[in-house]
Regions:
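C-terminal catalytic lobe of FAD-dependent flavoproteins
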Residues: 169-231
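Mid-domain catalytic core of redox enzymes
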Residues: 66-189
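Conserved beta-strand termini and adjacent loop/short-helix elements that scaffold enzyme active sites
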Residues: 59-63, 140, 199
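Aromatic-acidic/polar surface patches that form glycan- and anion
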Residues: 36-43, 126-127, 206-213
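Active-site/ligand-binding neighborhood in enzyme catalytic cores
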Residues: 1-85
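Conserved beta-strand scaffold positions in the cores of enzyme catalytic domains, especially
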Residues: 58, 86, 153-155, 195-198
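Active-site catalytic microenvironments for nucleophilic, acid-base chemistry
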Residues: 53, 94, 223, 227
Length: 231
């Protein structure tokens, strides 16, 4: 916990520490959900198929602020007033140029290593809680179910404080009252924009697991469609 968050456990929000289960059980899985799995071909092909539609245009490597701007509670898209829905999933402080200060996050560095042997640690994920600089090692073949592989590949995760530098990714919001107060300032700026929805870890400054995030996204889509039906 101290390595991951850079704080003492007593200084960390119970919302965070409460995510780590302590179980007396013969079930040694981290999650206790009845159904668990990963996409057969991986997440990338799954998302590629989801986005492969004539009504969807994907642009990567584009800063949304190059296409969107906000003036007097009006959204402009490519310089033209836009009255449709915008679902924003990025960092909310960065959308508003961090004008109140940067929201604190923890980031991660991933170091991949390959070994010419059948197994490295014998399990998919092992947490390292003592003197190592990394917090956990993932050995992928135990997640994918691959057999007869040419060696084994692992990744070590090294946590550090997010600074906004190029190449860094904000993974985990640091849930403290002062940080929540700062987030609320940014949320107030977004609150006056019509049909502008905040969704996800960054936009909401919350921690979500993928199943909860998927459910939240589907609920938002249903709510938007229901609202459009009323208009």
């Amino acid at each position: 916990t101290m390595k991951q968050w850079g704080q003492k456990p007593e200084d960390i929000s119970p919302e965070v520490t409460g995510r780590v289960p302590v179980l007396v059980s013969y079930d040694n899985r981290y999650f206790q959900d009845k159904y668990q799995g990963v996409p057969k071909e991986g997440f990338t092909p799954m998302f590629e198929r989801m986005l492969d539609h004539e009504n969807i245009t994907v642009e990567t490597g584009v800063d949304c602020k190059e296409r969107l701007r906000f003036e007097e509670n009006q959204i402009y898209f490519d310089g033209t007033p836009f009255d449709g829905e915008v679902i924003y999933t990025g960092a909310l402080d960065e959308l508003f140029d961090c004008q109140f200060g940067r929201l604190p996050y923890r980031s991660l560095r991933f170091d991949f290593e390959h070994y010419e042997k059948e197994s490295y640690q014998g399990h998919s994920v092992v947490n390292y809680t003592v003197s190592e600089d990394f917090t956990r090692i993932t050995e992928f073949k135990y997640l994918t179910g691959q057999k007869n592989t040419d060696g084994t590949t692992i990744v070590k995760e090294y946590p550090f404080a997010y600074t906004g530098a190029e190449g860094e990714i904000p993974y985990y919001a640091i849930l403290e009252p002062k940080n929540q107060e700062l987030y609320e300032k940014y949320r107030a700026l977004a609150g006056g924009l019509p049909h502008f929805y905040l969704l996800g870890r960054l936009a909401e400054y919350k921690y979500y697991n993928i199943d909860a995030m998927t459910k939240k996204a589907m609920e938002l889509a249903d709510a938007i469609m229901a609202e459009n039906t009323k208009r």
